[in-house]
């Protein structure tokens, strides 16, 4: 996977099929990190493991005389968090939605709206930025759906647009643009999300990918949507991948327990 992603990066950013060690600049690793996490949508922990392998290869090349210098020895990449993904709860999502902005804060408001759209559709950053009118499909009942292939895996996603997503899409609509949403550079987007979190008073640190987890957990699974359906909407190749999102949350536990109590009362049973 590391070799394939490196080749993809070199083709996309250097317009070449390969690079020699002497052609590698010191910022090569950082650029690759931005490409892998931003444009491809890989987890930070996955990117970290790839960079570790690249540095090992460069060290071996220097030791064997294939490279004149020891490349990237002082370059450090964040390990990321490989634990279970975190999602915003209802309170945090409402705090984010309630934010108000002055006229000069249009970029910050746009970043908030794009993030909320991701929360209601489950689309990853790289897919969000590529969505266009051709990805909108109307079903027999007149409902609007997003239909696209994930850039990361190529797996087909079908997501019915909730009223909140439709409202945000209409707000961000611009006839002069082919894409459904305005383009925000990945680094700028992450910076805006940090500012939004602090402004809203949300304690949980979140990134672009938190929106995807929020869709899986708060918007769908906690509302009773079957995990098989959620898996299809997220573009997961197997349900097992989606099960990482399906851990029982306190809210879900309380709701299921309340349903159990109501069920036993209806049947005049005791627990």
PLM segments and residue spans:
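Conserved tyrosine-mediated DNA breakage-rejoining catalytic core shared by Y-recombinases
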Residues: 74-77, 82, 90, 121, ...
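Short, basic (Lys/Arg/His-rich) helix/loop patches that form interaction surfaces
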Residues: 101-108, 174-179, 183, 190-232
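C-terminal catalytic core of tyrosine-transesterase DNA break-rejoin enzymes
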Residues: 116, 120-127, 212-237, 244
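N-terminal DNA-binding recognition helix of tyrosine site-specific recombinases/integrases
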Residues: 2-12, 19, 39-73, 124-126
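Basic, Lys/Arg- and aromatic-enriched nucleic-acid-binding interface segment
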Residues: 42-44, 48-50, 67-125
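C-terminal secondary-structure termini that scaffold catalytic or DNA-interacting sites
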Residues: 175, 259-271
